[in-house]
Amino acid sequence: MNRVSPDPGMHPRPGRSRRGSLRQRLRNVCTRRRIVIAGALLLGAAVLALLVPQAWYFHQVRQLAEHNPDSTAFMDLRRAQDGGTNIDFRWVDYTEIAPGLRRAVVAAEDGGFMAHNGFEWAAMGEAWRDWREADRPLRGASTISQQLAKNLFLSEERSLRRKLQEAAITWMLESQLDKRRILELYLNVIEWGDGVFGAEAAAQRFYGVRASELDTWQAAVLAARIPRPRYYHRHGETTFLIRRAARIEQWAAHARIP
């Protein structure tokens, strides 16, 4: 009886099978390693894209402790929007701004200025709920520090992304500058009318006096202009503006300032 010899190709040798399995495992390891490296690179790029702008903003804020700004994002925006509108911007020191104007602005825009760390959380919560529940644009509820962040570096866009960037810059301002410097910057760079930026330019444009010479009523009217400076420049002292100024003049007597 003849024995049939087994075909060598039917049963691979154990050594060859183990080598093939090892190569496959090595391929899998290399593939996973490439995926991990690619993911790490993408994550690193994303983190870098977030951190580089923040580092730039932080450097700019640190500079503001010692140097007065020559211009702001809002001034540049007005120049671009209005075809080269002449910007009336005259810097004055904090002590050259009438105490009545300092008090009126704090009373009108941010009564808790001296107490908070840059944010009024209750007001921000209400604005957030309005945005989420009613699909409305993100509304104000901004402190003086938040308004300063926006005026110096950002735009008028009302979006979540811009609000988050505003919050980051606000934290930088509050951590690097004292309240007096923040208020000094604010009073010098905010818009008071068409192309009119800062308390000195506003006092001279609307009342023909220096910022240090404003009386309490003039200060209250200027503070009342802040939410809609260009509108009031074009329409003058409306009934609503006068009524609001009267309330601000009363509130200002109790406002805390640096």
Which sequence ranges carry the predicted segments?
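Juxtamembrane regions of bacterial inner-membrane/periplasmic proteins
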Residues: 2-258
